[in-house]
Amino acid sequence: MSSSPASSPGPVSPASSRRGSPRRPEWAGRNYTLLTGAAVITNLGSHGALIATAFAVVQAGGSAGDVGLVAAARTLPLVLFLLIGGAIADRIPRHHVMVAANALNCVSQAVFAFLVLTGDPQLWQMMLLTALCGTGTAFFNPAAEGMLMASVSGPHANRAFALFRMAMNGAGVGGAALGGAMVALLGPGWVLAVDAAAFAAAGALRAFLDVGHIAERAPGGGLLTDLREGWVEFRSRPWLWSIVLQFSVVVAVVGAAEAVYGPLVALERLGGAAPWGVALAFFGLGTIGGAVLMMVWKPRRLLLAGTLCVFPLALPSAGLAVPLPVWGLCLVMFVSGAAIEVFGVSWMTTMHQEIPEEMFSRVSAYDWFGSLSMLPLATAVAGPVESAIGRTSALWGCAALVVVVTAAVLLVPDVRHMTRKPSATIGPDTESGGNAGALDLAKPSPADPSPAAV
């Protein structure tokens, strides 16, 4: 890890203020409310589905390598189609892209659930279905970020992003805990079915988003022209591409550790799916704590504060390497969750103030593409690396890489010196619809590779 005047809350008269009528904040308009509700529903399903997918592979007789292949099958099309998704999202109404992507994810998860509930699915079937889910996410993410950025006005950006992510991550806490418990009690198939239903419900909400306030682009050019324009915007900003390079490594190693090694450590050393679900829930609790902090804290040096908070993302890999008892793993997951949320809000605020709205989905697509580019390889080779050097050494290596690349990106002057601009000079004009509406989506959260979600 992003409205029409008709959906704006409108002015508050002195008389209505005296009557004390309950009102939402002026920036929490219709689009913001719909997107927040849809994100909550999606995260309730998806966090449990991440656990269920790994355990479905193991239940079908799969190995660590098979778990990695299924994870890679999801992330590979996600990476391949992100740039096209970003270009399309800047050309047609973004909510149409979001609804279509949700429909694809709903169908793929429903079929996956059916196969798991009616028998042992084949590895190729699980890979195909997760690949379809990844394809939907590739088109969804840039459109969702663009919609979010167009829905929040500059003066309220920091608080709006923090509140949005707090609601989304709060749902993730419940989803991870409930998903882990459901896998243990009912099996992974029912959790995948719940995820399919969540995509259907969220897509229905997103169908009502209003994009009438967003100016239509002038005709001319094609997808390749759009991609070139996005690339020029992306490469012209050293702070942007350097942090994307950093996260290409961070997301890869943390994603491999938590998507492949984490469930196996839980199964062999911690007691199964339920304790792992609790640990992921504590990551979510940490993100809520970080979001609460960012509701009131506005660091002047946005990227310096955010980047320093990437170092704690090494802790979960180290905790799995030891391995820590469940309570210790929950503690390090909480700390890393709070830290990544500080980064996430700082990153979203920086993007909001620096990137033109009409370019945002394309620039966001390059961000996602770079950040996720190494994740398919990392998850695919996690099994062979474990066989070659052992799981403990692999996990310590993941932790070390997070520390090294984060220290390296602090050498970039723009990362150290990027400052928060006066709020009156950034963000969409509040009189052109900025108040009307608000995924996951700053950097992809390592514990939530579906991004909204590392």
Q: Language-model segments: what does each one mean?
A:
Residues 2-444, 449-454:
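Alpha-helical transmembrane-bundle signature of multi-pass membrane transport and export proteins
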